[in-house]
């Protein structure tokens, strides 16, 4: 037995630390080493819950007043997992890189090569684990399990959005975590299927493209962006969300994900600064009793590309960290758009929301405010 394996074994098994600490979709160095305050104990523990994989989904029946949530990861799992790790940009970290940055958090038996994937695929699996708390809370609130799909899964099975996927769904959550270099784009048939979905009364489309870092070809500007967010696991260029951009273009959603901005912290608590919420515009009450989302060091600014204030409503903005310069703040900005709403219009009976996917991926490290936001989405229409 290798000494490394022996050391891991003697640490003891117990409950995996991923059940007790924050583990967000883009695993940042800071998140690996800290746990949000007021963490809420989970009511369902992963190790005690049956987990399915590679199964045909049984459609959920409609229940009045109880929403059926679906998560759709826009990536090609094989293409992301098989990226050349000698490439510096536009790829996910390997699990080995995560372990190095987060040491010694992942030096436990459950993270060894005997039990967990060590390459990029291991990091992708962290993302899947990171939605379990959200699934539990929403499932308890609605009485329906949250279904999780991938555009192209581990087995290479392609699942475009169509009437079958959307048919048993009331709230469709599009998690835009595909690197643009992998060329995932919504087809005309998918766009039409989503448009048809939104003609159904009571539907909601949540679009969550992640950050777009390093757009400029100027190395100095890329370095400024990197120094601003300060996460060693994020390369100097990491551009996400071609699929969501193509979907939004097809649906006429005048919004674009830009930058990767570090939220400001409250000097009193060192936690993420409170949202600037436009509560008078929040007609559905999604932000009722919600003061903050969760801290993530590189969040997108959702730039509105139309002057029509009735078409898109900015419901919340996040103060940005001013301690390190960034092109966004140098242009005079102090807050970035973080939660947007397109109310029903014309033949579209459903709502369209925009919020970064990491808001839904805190694994057993959420706060009361975040739990209330999730519950509001599940129960308010």
Where are the model-predicted features located?
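N-terminal export signals
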Residues: 5-24
